[in-house]
Amino acid sequence: MSDEILNGAAAPADAAAGPAFTIEKIYVKDVSFESPNAPAVFNDANQPELQLNLNQKVQRLNDNAFEVVLAVTLTCTAGGKTAYVAEVQQAGVFGLVGLEPQAIDVLLGTQCPNILFPYVRTLVSDLIQAGGFPPFYLQPINFEALYAETLRQRSQGETSLADSEPAGNA
């Protein structure tokens, strides 16, 4: 089924089975860790400040497959200097066959990022520890609430996740 979905054709048996939501592939698209002020930053006694940026992008690959990228940038500063910047783009290819556009949109905006998030959390924590810093654990994110906010913004004229190329912020 995987090759058929990625190639844009659903197998006849799949069509008879009804709607389907499948995880075709989960992968790291991009990863970066920078600690521009190491090793001096390890001795900084200032309270660290963390800034988290979260972004979701959706790209239609064909009629039945979408790439969803969950991007996280975590910046830690201490004493006005950057301690580290960890950036992760975790991606997945998801098959959506026989679903209405609204159902596809909900899955892309809620379930797909929920599936990708544990991978992001682990990778961010591992990067930070490998950089010599105490672990940081991303707290759970309510993607349903973020999707509801996206719907509210969309009511002001934006398009759906399924209709767009790279689109959607979470």
Curated annotation (Swiss-Prot):
Its main location: cytoplasm. The keyword Protein biosynthesis does not apply. InterPro entries: SecB, SecB-like_sf. GO terms for biological process: protein folding; protein tetramerization; protein transport. One of the proteins required for the normal export of preproteins out of the cell cytoplasm. It is a molecular chaperone that binds to a subset of precursor proteins, maintaining them in a translocation-competent state. It also specifically binds to its receptor SecA. Homotetramer, a dimer of dimers. One homotetramer interacts with 1 SecA dimer. This is Protein-export protein SecB. It comes from Xanthomonas campestris pv. campestris (strain ATCC 33913 / DSM 3586 / NCPPB 528 / LMG 568 / P 25). The lineage of its organism: Bacteria, Pseudomonadati, Pseudomonadota, Gammaproteobacteria, Lysobacterales. The gene is secB.
